[in-house]
């Protein structure tokens, strides 16, 4: 039986001007154990497309978010290489290969947005 990787959209909050912009993620993605799933995160040339500072977070219910990918494609120590990040134009992607049951979670993207805005 397939199980879902639930996705939410993370807003980028402007810390200087208090401007706010949204990075667009699909509402959900799903796959069966062993398969691969790719999650997209679409922004603009002012955020995702303009900088190589896209991060991805995984959050299980009741737990704090965990950094999975930073600077588009870098993995922190301890994150399995089943998780990989990439970017093309204004869209960043997170691919989870060899899906495992523990991968079922919420996944958030974030991007630097310029002018001291995140």
Curated annotation (Swiss-Prot):
Q: Where in the cell is it found?
A: Secreted; Cell membrane
Q: Where is this region: Framework-2?
A: 54-70
**Which residues are reported to carry the modification Pyrrolidone carboxylic acid?**
20
What's in the keyword line of the UniProt record? Answer: Adaptive immunity, Cell membrane, Disulfide bond, Immunity, Immunoglobulin, Immunoglobulin domain, Membrane, Pyrrolidone carboxylic acid, Secreted, Signal
Stretch list, region Disordered: 76-97
GO biological process, any: immune response
User: What are the cysteine partners in each disulfide bond?
Assistant: 41-109
List compositional bias (Polar residues) regions by residue number. 85-97
Q: Which SMART domains match?
A: IG, IGv
Q: Which residue intervals make up region (Complementarity-determining-3)?
A: 110-118
Q: Where is the Ig-like domain?
A: 20-118
- UniProt region (Framework-3), positions on chain: 74-109
Q: Which GO terms describe its cellular component?
A: extracellular region; immunoglobulin complex; plasma membrane
What this protein is reported to do is described as: V region of the variable domain of immunoglobulin light chains that participates in the antigen recognition. Immunoglobulins, also known as antibodies, are membrane-bound or secreted glycoproteins produced by B lymphocytes. In the recognition phase of humoral immunity, the membrane-bound immunoglobulins serve as receptors which, upon binding of a specific antigen, trigger the clonal expansion and differentiation of B lymphocytes into immunoglobulins-secreting plasma cells.
UniProt protein name = Immunoglobulin lambda variable 2-8
Organism whose genome encodes this protein: Homo sapiens (Human)
Task: Tell me the organism's taxonomic lineage.
Answer: Eukaryota, Metazoa, Chordata, Craniata, Vertebrata
């Amino acid at each position: 039986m397939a199980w879902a990787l639930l996705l939410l959209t993370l807003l980028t909050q402007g810390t200087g001007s208090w401007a706010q912009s949204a990075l667009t993620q699909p509402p959900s993605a799903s796959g069966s154990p062993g398969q691969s799933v790719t999650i997209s995160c679409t922004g603009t040339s002012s955020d995702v497309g303009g900088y190589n500072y896209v991060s991805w977070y995984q959050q299980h219910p009741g737990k704090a978010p965990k950094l999975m990918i930073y600077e588009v494609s870098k993995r922190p120590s301890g994150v399995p290489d089943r998780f990989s990040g990439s970017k093309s134009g204004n869209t960043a992607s997170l691919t989870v290969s060899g899906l495992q049951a523990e991968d079922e979670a919420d996944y958030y993207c974030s991007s630097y947005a310029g002018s001291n805005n995140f």
